[in-house]
UniProtKB/Swiss-Prot annotation:
One of its GO terms (cellular component) is cytosolic large ribosomal subunit. Belongs to the universal ribosomal protein uL18 family. This is Large ribosomal subunit protein uL18. One of its GO terms (biological process) is translation. Keywords: Ribonucleoprotein, Ribosomal protein, RNA-binding, rRNA-binding. Part of the 50S ribosomal subunit. Contacts the 5S and 23S rRNAs. The lineage of its organism: Archaea, Methanobacteriati, Methanobacteriota, Stenosarchaea group, Halobacteria. This is one of the proteins that bind and probably mediate the attachment of the 5S RNA into the large ribosomal subunit, where it forms part of the central protuberance. InterPro entries: Rbsml_uL18_euk (IPR005485). GO terms for molecular function: 5S rRNA binding; structural constituent of ribosome. The gene is rpl18. PANTHER family: LARGE RIBOSOMAL SUBUNIT PROTEIN UL18 (PTHR23410:SF12), RIBOSOMAL PROTEIN L5-RELATED (PTHR23410).
Amino acid sequence: MATGPRYKVPMRRRREVRTDYHQRLRLLKSGKPRLVARVSNAHVRAQLVTPGSDGDETHAAASSEELGEYGWDAPTGNLPSAYLTGYLAGARAVDAGLDEAVLDIGLNTATPGNKTFAVQEGAIDAGLEIPHNDDVLADWSRTRGEHIAAYAEQLDEPLYSGDFDAADLPEHFDDVLATIQEDHE
């Protein structure tokens, strides 16, 4: 490890590859709440947070693990579940009195049509005003999971083990979305 007066150790969360402080400062300067979208292969999480003196304050949050309460039987790490998680977080934020936000994608790459932007699209459809470019949002057919259903129909054996049939994903998506909308009217 380098030593001496000219060597500067990066901040701990930057060394752990967890925080981009330059991006965080730009988002905080906007003065708007942040829609923090974090995705993994298994789950999706969305939170609306504002900076506070003792750390960020969370006003509304949703996880794809909660979608089971609304009847979601499909896996929770795909694009349709990311949209539904964003919609659920956006609906909770609107219920909490928030009406605008900026998207915080963290260290994720801004690839058009990915799950992070599906979270944003869900929050926008729930009633939040988030500045965005429509080119980064996925097609509605992809958001509903029609690409997953088409792939499942090509297979000889079921795509997922268990009771859920992936070929029915678009209809299942519509049913769960309607349930969430009824719950947050």
